[in-house]
Each structure stands twice: as C-alpha cells, then as structure tokens.
C-alpha cells in the first residue's frame, strides 16, 4: 500500500487535495528497470522532502534548470538532457516503471545533468522548488480527461498556473503540449487568464514545436495519420 497524493480541482481551479492509500496498479518493474533503480537512484534520484532544493549543490554547478512534469518512460527527457549539456534537468514522474526506464536510458546515454523525482509534482513544486528558480517548466501530453465531467481532474487549472509561475524566473517559460485539441483550448483559456504571463505565440494561440522538444515516435505516427499536436508557450513577465 502506498500513500499517493491525487489532485482534483473545483470550478475556480482550486486544489481539492485528497490523499488516498491504495495499491498502485502500475505493473512490475522489468529486470532492467529494477537494476537501474538500484544502481542509478543514488546518483540521479531525488528523495522528496518538504525542504527547498539547493540546485547548485545537487548538480555541482550553477546553470539554468528545466523541470518536466510527468516524463513517462523518460526517452524524450533524456534526449533533451543529452542535447543540452549546458542545462540542468529535473524530471518528476509517479509511475515507478517509468522512473526506472528513465534512469536506465539516462545511464546508457551517459548524461550527468539529469535528476528525477518519484513523487507528486504539485508537492514538489510547492515545497521543494525554490521560488523563481527555474528557466523552463515542461508539461507534455498530460492526461486530457476528455469526458466533460472529468475536466476538473485536468492538471492545467488557474491555481496550477500560479504554482508554475511562482517556480519560474522572470523570463522563464511554461511549455505545454497536447494532442487533444479540446485540451489545447482549455490550456489557452487558463493561461490567457493567468496573471503574470505572456503568450509567446505571435498569433496569440499556439507555437510551432520548438527544436528543444523531441518528436516522439507516437507523435510522428500521429502526424502521418493526420493527427494534430498543439504546443503552447507562456513566458513569466511579472
């Protein structure tokens, strides 16, 4: 049994926090994932604590830091870390096999500028990240909760937008991506109303996929089938 924080939101986008204790039905780790957790966690893992992180101490240097929420199996995150050795990267994922997979790929790639949390992202952002310390926050392909009655479960809500804003430096960017058009419209509605942000799109809506976000195999297949992907980037200006 594990205590896992799950977030729901009311009509105003306020957190309705619930802590539930339940068996995580996430499947067993593969042998490779388990080995990576054992061998690489001491090197790249960050144990959650409600104390602010000292990023310079964690990475052994001063550098702009990018944080990704929900990195899945970690392939894209590792690719970004390898392509930008001048940046520090932090990933957050609640799915343990995904954390194990990410650590395995990171070790194979030889990246040294990546650290990961196996924890709830909102708790990490609120308690472990020093305010105004991040250069970019990434939220790629979050659960769309496509049924209308489930929209309150979508992570992109007004209070969440302010949590992200508090973590970003002035000039820092919140980068979102989704393959659900309705969710992209929801994201834009929330972010356009959020104080302290400016849309980086010259047309006031979405942007072209920037070079720093790798094209996933799933996304490439979607393009071939005519499916859309929407990238949204908002800069903290206040």
Curated annotation (Swiss-Prot):
Catalytic activity: guanosine(46) in tRNA + S-adenosyl-L-methionine = N(7)-methylguanosine(46) in tRNA + S-adenosyl-L-homocysteine
PANTHER family: 3-DEOXY-D-MANNO-OCTULOSONIC-ACID TRANSFERASE/TRNA GUANINE-N 7 - -METHYLTRANSFERASE (PTHR23417), PENTACOTRIPEPTIDE-REPEAT REGION OF PRORP DOMAIN-CONTAINING PROTEIN (PTHR23417:SF14)
Keyword Ion transport: no
Pathway the protein contributes to: tRNA modification; N(7)-methylguanine-tRNA biosynthesis
CDD domains registered for this protein in UniProt: AdoMet_MTases (cd02440)
GO molecular function, one term: tRNA (guanine(46)-N7)-methyltransferase activity
Residues where substrate binds: 147, 179, 216-219
Chain positions recorded as S-adenosyl-L-methionine binding sites: 68, 93, 120, 143
Record keywords: Methyltransferase, S-adenosyl-L-methionine, Transferase, tRNA processing
Gene Ontology CC annotations of this record: tRNA methyltransferase complex
Record-given protein name: tRNA (guanine-N(7)-)-methyltransferase
EC number from the UniProt entry: 2.1.1.33
The organism of origin for this protein: Shewanella woodyi (strain ATCC 51908 / MS32)
Upper taxonomic lineage: Bacteria, Pseudomonadati, Pseudomonadota, Gammaproteobacteria, Alteromonadales
Xref: InterPro entries: SAM-dependent_MTases_sf, tRNA_(Gua-N-7)_MeTrfase_Trmb, tRNA_methyltr_TrmB_bact
Family: Belongs to the class I-like SAM-binding methyltransferase superfamily. TrmB family.
Active site: 143
Role: Catalyzes the formation of N(7)-methylguanine at position 46 (m7G46) in tRNA.
